[in-house]
């Protein structure tokens, strides 16, 4: 019998009590010779990306047990950022990532599980489970709930998503009837919101990290093909257990799959597909858990050489995740990157000996396997539903046009510089992040006048009250991991700037973060944050700020001497907002803030404080 971790709680006379309890869960004599595989589910009726997951854990469990494992399912929490947005609920979103990671670690270690299947989907759940998997370093397979179908309405000639509903709601020229129509049409099915927002970005990145199956990030939640991903995950995790525990093959462990090279691959993909800036935060956090020295400097280096090969909503209205899938999904983007010499193809995945082998099998422009071609023809049915695997619609053709299609070749890239950039300067000494895919080229270099707000709420009020003018740089500070606390998303301020016609004539800088739905010159993750003594806390109304994306710089046009004077004054006052905010900060949030690092460290806990 292999030397399973679970033997700690299943073997030996002194474990009679534990075995009695295992038996009470349904285990038989023969089960104590099998690997115990945890299924970390995240079903909840609060979140459309998770509302359909209730029965999927047991679907995986049956497949695990059919192939020789013992499956034990548990649940963790899931916060819907869209529902939590615009009020104090957003303070809990990023901290929930740490709770999710902890809860998975607690359950798996407390019960000595041998492996995990992580059933995630939305914004903080995939990152939280990824952090846990890399902490635990036992065999794992990720399988997410899948993306939502894009919405449709006669009032628009393009697919709709959540951001469209938010933008029209903030546009005074839109009638109540139009707003209501968009609201009812934007989110028609279960699944993670239909554009390249944070949830879908992260689920795509698990493919590049090598920890999930091909199609995980792009196969629609409603499509029957997605069921096969769950079944394959159940079979695969048993195989990984056999390889590790039975054969001593450590190459299957998460830290050996998600190596430094794999993190570079994931970030390269993120840049190429114009993913959410939140993915940077989460990859940095995951790298910390894997004990990898992967940081913003590495991301900056990659951002300078990786072109943008895919453009999806919110960066363009024409394409949503269903279109990415039709174009071959993530492995077609990885294939183009590989042909451009931009990908490490020698790294393993949980399903293939190497990324090169996986690309050869799954890239629609390389493979001749008709089953693969059929798989990527899976499309939307256009029928509102909250039921997984409820339709089997297929496109007649694939989108394999690498010159003008959804996915482009390196030679025909949307732009030769990728969709994300890291900026440094005296206002963000440790860096800040911008999603260049959503920035109009006319404002890649922008000098503006600082307009200071010390909370997201006050910024929203100011924008809606027309206090922000063309040429302003809206600065929202004390919204970082420690200062918020919780590093709120700033989707409402950016959406309202857009609805006011200021999207191409203003910028926004914050130590908070942005939704994957953000577009415009929106710069987040300013590090160090204001609450940690960052220079963003020294900016005054009327100061000039120069943003230079091509040169990767952002600077407050104030002398070093003046900044030193301001810093001394701020040290005396304390690094906190001038006016108290009407914000209830619970004990749980205060505990999070106490240990939170700035965004350049992934906003993870400060281990130095824990180690004393």
Curated annotation (Swiss-Prot):
Which cofactors go with this protein? [2Fe-2S] cluster; Mg(2+)
| Disulfide bridge positions per record | none
Give the E.C. number(s): 4.2.1.9
GO biological process terms, alphabetically, are:
isoleucine biosynthetic process; L-valine biosynthetic process
Tell me which residues bind Mg(2+).
Answer: 81, 123-124, 489
Database matches in InterPro entries: Dihydro-acid_dehy_C, DihydroxyA_deHydtase, DiOHA_6PGluconate_deHydtase_CS, ILV_EDD_C, ILV_EDD_N, IlvD/EDD_N
What positions does UniProt annotate as the active site of this protein? 515 (proton acceptor)
Catalytic reactions on record? (2R)-2,3-dihydroxy-3-methylbutanoate = 3-methyl-2-oxobutanoate + H2O; (2R,3R)-2,3-dihydroxy-3-methylpentanoate = (S)-3-methyl-2-oxopentanoate + H2O
Task: Mark the residues carrying the PTM N6-carboxylysine.
Answer: 124
Q: Where is the signal peptide?
A: none
* Keyword entries, A-Z: 2Fe-2S, Amino-acid biosynthesis, Branched-chain amino acid biosynthesis, Iron, Iron-sulfur, Lyase, Magnesium, Metal-binding
Note the PANTHER family from the entry: D-XYLONATE DEHYDRATASE, D-XYLONATE DEHYDRATASE YAGF-RELATED
**What does this protein do, in the record's words?**
Functions in the biosynthesis of branched-chain amino acids. Catalyzes the dehydration of (2R,3R)-2,3-dihydroxy-3-methylpentanoate (2,3-dihydroxy-3-methylvalerate) into 2-oxo-3-methylpentanoate (2-oxo-3-methylvalerate) and of (2R)-2,3-dihydroxy-3-methylbutanoate (2,3-dihydroxyisovalerate) into 2-oxo-3-methylbutanoate (2-oxoisovalerate), the penultimate precursor to L-isoleucine and L-valine, respectively.
What's the protein here called?
Dihydroxy-acid dehydratase
Organism whose genome encodes this protein: Ectopseudomonas mendocina (strain ymp) (Pseudomonas mendocina)
